[in-house]
Amino acid sequence: MKPLIVLNFKTYAESTGENALRLAMAAKQVASDSGVTIIVVPQIVDIFYISQHIEIPVYAQHIDGIEFGGHTGHVLAEALAQAGARGTLINHSERRLKLAEVDAANEAAKRAHLTTIICTNNIATTRAAASLNPDFVAIEPPELIGSGIPVSKANPEVVTGAVEAAKGIKVLCGAGISKGEDVKAAIELGTDGVLLASGVTKAPDPKEALQNLVAFV
């Protein structure tokens, strides 16, 4: 099975509004040409717009563990689903939650039939996240995020340890991923794919960067 590539748009100017749509369209084309599943994760305000223009999966960057009601400023699972999202990140290092909040968000996502990716930063948090039975965990040591130094090379033991700690839950590898060889290394360490952002979103040619990512798989 080919690996999964999850592209987090974050809140960069290069991946906001019309730029977000252009980036999503590039991901759609590369996914179609390569047969690799590419998931795009735009800002919440761009989800509906993007989901109207592409067929590849669109995920949210965050979700709150709430139900319908008086929760001003929160992100409701059902609203994401109606906007076209098929899944969501939970507990990204730039949007950290307490374990109880992670659990509530995961349950809310399941209620709305959204696929969940719980982000973790070490083996211990991976074990805790896996116990909540998400669809994926994504191991991302925060010191390597945006560094261009892939965790699969800088600290492969963290990746293999996370795979073991996840106990059957699918694992994604994040932090510093920017090249096809990084994806290949992550897969060889036992993961099911990668989570990345700036290696593509801030690349001079994002489509070319995506093509490089899938070239080794």
For each feature predicted by the language model, list its residue ranges.
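Conserved, mostly hydrophobic/aromatic
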Residues: 10, 43, 80, 140, ...
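Structural motif
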Residues: 33, 83, 112, 132, ...
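Residue-level detector of anion-binding/catalytic polar loops
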Residues: 57, 86, 115, 135, ...
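Active-site-adjacent beta->alpha loops and helix N-cap segments on the catalytic face
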Residues: 16-23, 42-52, 68-78, 93-108, ...
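Catalytic cores of alpha/beta
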Residues: 120-133, 173, 177-194
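Short, conserved beta-strand edge motifs with alternating hydrophobic and charged residues
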Residues: 41, 117-120, 138-140, 174
